[in-house]
Amino acid sequence: MKKINQYKLLAGICALSLFTACDFEELNTNPFEMTDEMGIRDGVAVGGAVTAMQRAVVTVGTQADDTDAINQYQVAYNLSADSWSGFFGQNNNWYSGSNNTTYYLQDNWVAATYTNSYTTLLSSWKKIKQESEKTETPEIFALAQILKISAWHKTLESFGPIPYTHAGEPALVIPFDSEQVAFNAMFTDLTAAIDILTVRAEQGATIVADYDAVYAGDTRKWVKYANSLMLRLAMRISYADETTAQKYARQALNHPFGVMTSKSDEAQMSTGAGMVFRNNIDWLANQYNECRMGSSMFSYLLGYQLSLIHISEPTRHLRIS
């Protein structure tokens, strides 16, 4: 009788083990959360990362972000390059006048420029790279490459050497590339991305349309944008390396799709990917009451009065006061 009871107990334990093994994953999966498999199937795994990269090229936010993205844009760009270029002037006197606009650089503002133009989008780029390799979707990684270069060329031009060719690798120390090496790598990466997206565009394909807040997945427009970016980089190095500059400028201009030539080609984020984005300059000018048109820009526009009409009120980018 004792042996019979032992066998029954053993059988019961085995049955319970089998039941537990069969139902463990199901019981421990949140029915209200997306699994990795579902994310890959629905495109969310890379789609969300694409949107995140787009929002990091030039920091932009929505109402849900409150004013965080606007503040990040202000200290990273508006109080430095935007003002130094003469496009904008400032109606505030931060740090008693000792700030970036007077060339007294604030370390935290400089750090914000590096973080927003380089660090922020690195994790999203790595995720897209990994997922596109798993799912064999090189066109999505091609888009990620274009977005990465859109942001990182600003870092390169602002800070000099940056980690580029080995960025994202699992190493304790990532080497910095010289400006020449980084620019050449960007041209190579852009060429590869353009080639991939050109094929998809000729097939009439769109990519991650629901998550693309710029062109809604229009591959032809992305190719034109990438060609324009290539032309811009070529012009940037024209005095340092005329031969390379001419090569890639011609390559961009001679591409069958060409470069951006009309307003419909404009790469801008106002609504898209199910979101409504805030205009940073509008907020800095009309909500913060701090950003104004720069005197240099105003002086240039005085030479053609109609320019003042088109650049001030209708777009609500800024007001002339």
For every predicted segment, state its role.
Residues 1-20:
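Sec-dependent bacterial lipoprotein signal peptides
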Residues 15, 20, 72, 97-98, ...:
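Preference for short coil/turn "hinge" residues that link or interrupt alpha-helices
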Residues 318-321:
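N-terminal low-complexity segments that are often proline-rich with Ser/Thr-Pro
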Residues 22-85:
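Membrane-proximal, proline-rich intrinsically disordered regions
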Residues 40-44, 90-308, 312, 316:
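Structured, solvent-exposed acidic/aromatic patches
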